[in-house]
Amino acid sequence: MKLSLSPPPYADAPVVVLISGLGGSGSYWLPQLAVLEQEYQVVCYDQRGTGNNPDTLAEDYSIAQMAAELHQALVAAGIERYAVVGHALGALVGMQLALDYPASVTVLVSVNGWLRINAHTRRCFQVREQLLHSGGAQAWVAAQPLFLYPADWMAARAPRLEAEDALALAHFQGKNNLLRRLNALKRADFSHHADRIRCPVQIICASDDLLVPTACSSELHAALPDSQKMVMRYGGHACNVTDPETFNALLLNGLASLLHHREAAL
């Protein structure tokens, strides 16, 4: 699996791995790259079955497989210890990595994540699946911003959204791959295992997230032994895109604090 690695800003700089959500594209993290690359070696990638890592996914494709293939690619690139920043599905992959490779994951940041899918989130995905089945990729892509962004943010950026739609259609991961990745997301359940995660965790959520209620992050915080929760008042599901200034400050401060906390504990 192809990875994109930034040059380390200094010798032995900590590594931060960015894992996007259901869309799977590493470019989702563009608003974070410039600030992160000043302090860390940053790893981005298109998830298997998407973008520049095309593949046909099995029907039983799982979050555990997503975690294993990423860890194997990191080890092949010479990276054995790393912090993980995951958004939604990416946060699930991050938790799986922390469970399966505890010696490798130094810190976990969960952005609008959850222990197991909430009934409201499931309802949102049911609607989106119906759109996909009835209207194809175009209907899926057209509806996607409604679940990602606040209304006023979208209204002020119509040309940008049109360009994003065209790009998303051009690089659509395919109906079968999308549904198999979505099914993996829906099956994931960390409610009985989260307390085994021993690395420090930063939880970031947005109070106006239409797709994932903030209660999901509260449940995460209660279940994870060494976690802290930060709530953004604005930003929607893709709060790192819509309000990068606020998000980046939370992320940078959280990573610095938790990595120091981890080193002090060793």
From Swiss-Prot:
It is an enzyme of class 3 (hydrolase). Keywords: Hydrolase. SUPFAM superfamilies: alpha/beta-Hydrolases. GO terms for molecular function: hydrolase activity, acting on carbon-nitrogen (but not peptide) bonds, in linear amides. It catalyses: carbamate + 2 H(+) = NH4(+) + CO2. The keyword Hydrolase applies. It holds the Pfam family Abhydrolase_1. One of its GO terms (biological process) is nitrogen utilization. Involved in pyrimidine catabolism. May facilitate the hydrolysis of carbamate, a reaction that can also occur spontaneously. Belongs to the AB hydrolase superfamily. Hydrolase RutD family. NCBIfam families: RutD. This is Putative carbamate hydrolase RutD. It comes from Escherichia coli O7:K1 (strain IAI39 / ExPEC).
